[in-house]
């Protein structure tokens, strides 16, 4: 996907944009996170500092070298009245070795220490990042692609953007089944953006998608999907799930009262 650097919007940039509502350019800001957080502050005319002395605000973002000392100093500043802006609330971060704590987990640690929420959040699920991205492009028919319901899909819904959930990161088919919000499209990865999208169709006994079929077996309290690829089965099952919601409620899926059998 061709894109210029000027068309890329980061949560750090949006967090700093929010900070402008609370503090003027030239203010000294304590940085928690990586180089991207620091650069966003410098670009906006703030003094980015790793030393908490004389800082009037804290911008907390992700960085693999964030330490207990960073979180402690941020907590002390916030308790003393400093403005607190978080770049994002992603609780986890996928790595090659598995799922690791994300910025949201570090924000939660500070929240537990100071007893309050951040004054602003730059990234998803807040819609601020989506609004800025659509203005920068500008977007006429945007599609938000992400791997999380609680941040990506939630942000798209908040901003009125069509969403596509991919299974190449954090979310799994089990998350699709339990989610109380719905992605507009489902894909295995961003590769599905350049392949023909096979959508689900309602049938007499459930839903079909490509070579897959999904049926609700009420006696067993299960939706069973068979045939086709895993993605086709999941798309059919997800459509059937949402057709059943008005009859059985979302909690039936979120709490496992109606289970999903993908034949795996």
Residues covered by each model-derived region:
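Asp-based, Mg2+/Mn2+-dependent phosphohydrolase catalytic module
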Residues: 1-9, 16-264
